[in-house]
Design a protein with these regions (language model features):
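Glycine-rich, charged/polar anion/phosphate-binding loops
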Residues: 55-57, 122-125, 151
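General detector of N-terminal leader/presequence modules that precede the first folded domain
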Residues: 1-91
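Ferredoxin-like iron-sulfur electron-transfer modules
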Residues: 125-131, 152-167
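Iron-sulfur (Fe-S) cluster-binding segments and ferredoxin-like electron-carrier domains
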Residues: 92-95, 142-156
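Cysteine-centered iron-sulfur cluster-binding motifs in ferredoxin-type domains/subunits
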Residues: 135-144, 162-167
C-alpha cells in the first residue's frame, strides 16, 4: 500500500510513471510476458487499495474527515491534458497542503466537486493511503493509470464500497 509519506515526498509520481511505462511495454510481444509477470507481483500488495466509490460513501468519508483538501489528480502529473480534481482527507490532506500540492476546502465544497465529477461521468475511486481511505478521485478513463491497468487485464480496482463507508 502507498503511504502518506510517499505522497508527501512525491515518490507517488515515480510509481505512476513506472506503471505507465509498464503498460506501454505490454504491447511489445518479445517482453510482454515478463512485464506482465513482474507487474502482477508488484500489484499483489495493492489488492483492495482502490475501490469504486458510491455517492453515499463519498459523503460519509468527507463529513467524517477533520480536514479536507483539493488538488489535481495524481495521474494529472503524467497526463497534463485532462485536469480534474481529487479530494484528500485528514493526514494526506495536511501533507499535500504542506507541500503546496493541495489547498484546504470546506466539506460542502468537496462534496460539490465529487457530485460534479459524477455528473460528468467520472469514475470515482477511493484510494487507501497508509491503510485509510484518504483520497477520493474523479478519474478519467483515458488518463487514469489504474484504469489503464484494468484495461490491460489487471484487477486493481475492487468492487463498490459499502454504503457505510467501512473500508
Amino acid at each position: 500500500m502507498v503511504t502518506v509519506e510517499e505522497y508527501k515526498s512525491e515518490k507517488i509520481f515515480g510509481y505512476m510513471k513506472q506503471i505507465d511505462t509498464a503498460v506501454k511495454l505490454l504491447n511489445i510481444p518479445l517482453i510482454k510476458n515478463i512485464v506482465r509477470r513482474k507487474l502482477t507481483e508488484k500489484l499483489e500488495k495493492h489488492s483492495g487499495d482502490f475501490i469504486v466509490a458510491l455517492p453515499e460513501d463519498v459523503d460519509i468519508l468527507i463529513n467524517s474527515a477533520e480536514i479536507v483538501a483539493i488538488g489535481p489528480r495524481m495521474c494529472y502529473h503524467l497526463y497534463k491534458k485532462d485536469l480534474s480534481y481529487a479530494i484528500f482527507l485528514d493526514e494526506l490532506a495536511k501533507a499535500l497542503i504542506q507541500i503546496g500540492y493541495a489547498k484546504e476546502i470546506s466539506k460542502e465544497d468537496a462534496i460539490i466537486v465529487m457530485k460534479e465529477g459524477k455528473k460528468r461521468g467520472r469514475l470515482q475511486l477511493i484510494s487507501n493511503v497508509s491503510g485509510k481511505p484518504l483520497e477520493l478521485c474523479n478519474q478519467s478513463r483515458k488518463t487514469c493509470s489504474l484504469w489503464k491497468l484494468e484495461k490491460a487485464g489487471f484487477k486493481i480496482i475492487a468492487g463498490k464500497c459499502t454504503s457505510k463507508a467501512n473500508i
